[in-house]
Amino acid sequence: MNSEQVTLVGQVFESYVSEYHKNDILLILKERDEDAHYPVVVNAMSLFETNMEIGDYFTVFPNEVLTVFDSALRRSALAILQSLPETEGLSMKQNLHARISGLPVCPELVREHIPKTKDVGHFLSVTGTVIRTSLVKVLEFERDYMCNKCKHVFMVEADFEQYYTFSRPSSCPSLASCDSSKFSCLSDLSSSPARCRDYQEIKIQEQVQRLSVGSIPRSMKVILEDDLVDSCKSGDDLTIYGVVMQRWKPFQRDVRCEVEIVLKANYVQVNNEQSSGMVMDEDTRKEFEDFWEHYKSDPFAGRNEILASLCPQVFGMYLVKLAVAMVLAGGIQRTDAAGTRVRGESHLLLVGDPGTGKSQFLKYAAKITPRSVLTTGIGSTSAGLTVTAVKDSGEWNLEAGALVLADAGLCCIDEFNSLKEHDRTSIHEAMEQQTISVAKAGLVCKLNTRTTILAATNPKGQYDPKESVSVNIALGSPLLSRFDLVLVLLDTRNEDWDRIISSFILENKGYPSKSENLWSMEKMKTYFCLIRNLHPTLSEVSNQVLLRYYQMQRQSDSRNAARTTIRLLESLIRLAEAHARLMFRSAVTLEDAVTAVSVMESSMQGGALLGGVNALHTSFPENPRAQYQRQCELILEKLELQGLLQEELRRLERLQNESVHQCQSHSLEEEVAPGSCRNDPRDKPRLRTSTQQEQSCSWSSTERSGADSPPGPGLNRPTSCNNSAENRDGRGDGLDWLDPTSSPEIAPESTIVSPNVKTTEKNVNLKISNNKSQGKEKHGPQQRSKLLEAGHLPSSGAMNAPLRSHGVKRTKASQAVVVSEAGRGDEEDSVPRRLPKLLKEGSQNVCRSTTRVRPLPPTVPLSLSIPSPGSGKRSGTPKRKRRKSAQVEEPEPEGMETPTVKLAKFTFKQKTKLTHSPEGQGPIPPSASEIAVDSSKIPQQRTRREAAVPVVAPGKSTSTSGDRCSDQLHGKTKELSRQPPDSNPPREEREQGPKRRVIQPKPELGNQAGHSHLACEKDRKEGVSCGNKSSKVHAGTIARLASFSFTSPSESKSESLPPERKDSRDSRDSRDSRDRCHSPPATTAPVLGQQRQTFQLQQPTERANLSTLSLFTLSELDDEALDFDWEEEMRKKP
């Protein structure tokens, strides 16, 4: 730079500092220490806006411009001091430094990686983590020399590029013609303090979370001088502004010169306080506040949407995701009056068999946490985890380990049991006291390790539930007690679970797609950074619950003495605060306390009230509010807090009523099908992600029984948002809201539904509404949309006309449309041609060899004959009769009626009757089937014989069963329900046979259902149905075929069967046997296996089976939607 450029830069910077940093300079002038170094931090963006020419000079000549800035800053301070009228208490300071920050964000100036050779001489901003700090040294940067010949005195500055060594000139620099080369140093004996400065070297490393997998983080040295010394410590995240420079040792003969790239720092910014690296503006906060306002009536549904976005590549595992989210949210750190610090970070240990997804959670947690370290136990030593003493250039330095680097962040340790015994003991202090005390190589210090530890380990051999966790994983009790939660993931080798997981993985591999309902990783990172700034306070109610639980744990006979210490109460407080943060609350409520207790109970550290649970098979609840209500009843009753329970139940009922009214108002305003509640994420279009499957298509073992539910309109509406809570059997004890496979009494009520959908729910609902159908479509049928586009199916009105529930008129014209399509049924089939022949021969052999079914033996299990507790407490009248009477006696107000209720008031003129499913799931009209029933051609002789069959007393709780055709049409597993005593299936079977028309869509992967057209073809050749209206089936054949048993995985095993009429069972089993002939044996489940005597595939195991439906099935069709009230028809006849 020439003199004119130096003058310009000095004048511009002096005027800028005098205008914008006058207050900073006044504060510096008031300081008493005149020899200290004082910084003035200048924002580069605002400075460059003042004069763009300075920016050009600064980029090209950073070292010269910084020197000019310091000189201009001193002149500006002097001018300000002289302009003040009173200078008392003010003194001029000579050691002023301009510190540049806030560079424009561009690749030329801002770097996240270590600079390279091409960056030498440029002013950059580099981000990294401090891994080593050296001792502070005294650096002499100037010396005076005198020429021995002419006595000329001159000053020599230390050369930074040669490690601050002094290089004497080759000749005397005096103006006189003195060519002497001998000089004497004038400062050999003592150096003036004015000629020395503080000097420190630190080593920074690239942040691991910003690197790709497999990249080894590089490191470089940073030179700190003057006021920058001791501005950081090991483990800090820094943003360093400085000039990239080279340096080398003085040249020596026959020695290779090694050049090193270092960063001479101008300003150091510590990012520990805002480690997220992102700015939390008002728009971001407002977005999350609107999200929780949207879920105000059902906050647990909003929480589950966040949990479903956590590690979405792992299917289910609801409990693990909840625990990981609570650990990432963290509690609040406290310091009492005595100065003792109580940690706020929770620690989680995942114990599980190989292949249960433990490492996936660790990797995802490390990604969404801004400050994280991921390591493994086998590759870590105690020094690598804590701190290492390293000797560098003749001196010992401390190098930070994984726990120190993860200070105020997350440390993930995989294969935790691989740590050596003496290495495990080294992290005791780091986990509890949150510090590490070091006394190595003469260095005694204490480093902070305020980190959350998320560890994963495998059990030692086969996990033995009878032994303690400490024995199973070979970890000592002192270390194990420092973990707040210990979750056990046991691979129970469940065949159905394996089928579901394999289908989920293959589906994502073959058809990868993203869900709009899932939160992105950036949004998750922003949310967890935001909620860590919340400080919820404990309420009196939550204190009461946590204290009572801690007392019961201490009094438990089976308590772990090493675990039930005061650490347990502190863990409960941390978990409750973490859940309040996760729910975006400013206070810890009863919901947070109950959730913390339930998670602690499911952990192997708890279990005093209800026992532990296998966290692997826990799935997302269908109704989060009902799940929480179940938790409240179990936990608060065990804790003997009846007052809190009643108050909470009243509050939940009030919230439920509000949400029901909100659902109905949305339905009326937008004129969509009933049951589409806006504040339920399950009603959004299903895409191929784990979110929708886990939130809305999971095993609903988490629901409550009907007897436990308060009498609110939301739990009893058949069109509620997929709410089937009223049909659950209540179990006395146990964590049945978390583990659907922990007991044979629990069986799946819903199915895992593939989110592979192309028709949105709104469109499907509009189609159904236009056709005046009362059934509710839960998912858009993909196969039906494809056939409609290809022109193979009639209109939706013709298809849905025979399936009206609650009695919608069906005209002769609609029947004609269905019948006219019967001739094209065979052309639509897309099944391999060899299957009909094989199935036909198999069915003929079975029909010849079977014998008449025997009546129920007296040793039938009670579960098959006695109504379940949930159903036994309902009304004594059959559900069909109750519904008919309810429609007449209890009309709803006109303003609150949904389209379903309005359609239900039509009078039913046909001789058939369709009812809603008693299972709590709304009937779904089939999307690819036509069923036409001409009841006028029923033989009168058969009617008289069926009318003479005695009717079971109406006091028993009953369920209904209908035609299986509609389930087969979707190409999915059939759902078998129970027959009511007032139905007559043989007549229905013969009546529907000639008129049934079936279109089978192309079967997809994982589809295990039978093909209806094969059954139709077999029956046509056997003379049973499908083509000959006058043909009859011999009663003996029907009875013999009844020895087959078939059940759908979606039927609940926990609900018992009421007594049935023999002919009802015969006809139902006849259809089942035909269906079974066309179904793979692997899809059958032995619900009725105890009743049948032949062809029994398997017995109910102690572990309840999971759903065997494929993830590619789109919707679940209710059999009861196709059931006919034959008793009513017989009464109409004379």
From Swiss-Prot:
The modification Phosphoserine is found at S754, S795. One of its GO terms (biological process) is gamete generation. It catalyses: ATP + H2O = ADP + phosphate + H(+). It is an enzyme of class 3 (hydrolase). Disruption phenotype: Females are viable but are sterile due to defects in double-strand break repair during gametogenesis. Males are not sterile and produce spermatozoa, but in much reduced quantity. Female ovaries are completely devoid of oocytes, and testes show a severe early proliferation defect of germ cells, causing a retarded development of only a fraction of seminiferous tubules that produce then apparently normal spermatozoa. Pfam families: MCM, MCM_lid, MCM_OB. One of its GO terms (molecular function) is DNA helicase activity. Its EC number is 3.6.4.12. Residues 659-1101 are annotated as: Disordered. PROSITE patterns: MCM_2. Residues 861-872, 1090-1099 have a biased composition (Low complexity). Residues 876-885 have a biased composition (Basic residues). Its main location: nucleus. Ubiquitously expressed. InterPro entries: AAA+_ATPase (IPR003593), MCM (IPR031327), MCM_dom (IPR001208), MCM_lid (IPR041562), MCM_OB (IPR033762), NA-bd_OB-fold (IPR012340), P-loop_NTPase (IPR027417). Induction: By E2F1 and serum stimulation. Keywords: ATP-binding, Chromosome, DNA damage, DNA repair, DNA-binding, Helicase, Hydrolase, Nucleotide-binding, Nucleus, Phosphoprotein. Residues 964-977, 985-994, 1014-1023, 1052-1078 have a biased composition (Basic and acidic residues). Component of the MCM8-MCM9 complex, a complex involved in the repair of double-stranded DNA breaks (DBSs) and DNA interstrand cross-links (ICLs) by homologous recombination (HR). Required for DNA resection by the MRE11-RAD50-NBN/NBS1 (MRN) complex at double-stranded DNA breaks to generate ssDNA by recruiting the MRN complex to the repair site and by promoting the complex nuclease activity. Probably by regulating the localization of the MNR complex, indirectly regulates the recruitment of downstream effector RAD51 to DNA damage sites including DBSs and ICLs. Belongs to the MCM family. Component of the MCM8-MCM9 complex, which forms a hexamer composed of MCM8 and MCM9. Interacts with the DNA mismatch repair (MMR) complex composed at least of MSH2, MSH3, MSH6, PMS1 and MLH1. Interacts with MLH1; the interaction recruits MLH1 to chromatin. Interacts with MSH2; the interaction recruits MCM9 to chromatin. Interacts with MSH6. Interacts with the MRN complex composed of MRE11, RAD50 and NBN/NBS1; the interaction recruits the MRN complex to DNA damage sites. Interacts with RAD51; the interaction recruits RAD51 to DNA damage sites. This is DNA helicase MCM9.
